[in-house]
Amino acid sequence: GGGGSGETSGMWFGPRL
């Protein structure tokens, strides 16, 4: 969902940003 290690649903950034 937000600046993490890429979620399945609702990817805001994807990798860690």
Swiss-Prot record:
Tissue distribution of the protein: Mainly in abdominal perisympathetic organs and to a lesser extent in retrocerebral complex.
Protein's UniProt keywords contain Ligase: no
GO biological process: neuropeptide signaling pathway
Residues recorded as bearing Leucine amide in the entry: 17
GO molecular function annotations of the record: neuropeptide hormone activity
Keyword line: Amidation, Neuropeptide, Secreted
Location relative to the cell: Secreted
UniProt cross-references to InterPro entries, sorted A to Z: Pyrokinin_CS
Any one GO CC term of the record: extracellular region
Function: Mediates visceral muscle contractile activity (myotropic activity).
Record family assignment: Belongs to the pyrokinin family.
Protein name: Pyrokinin-5
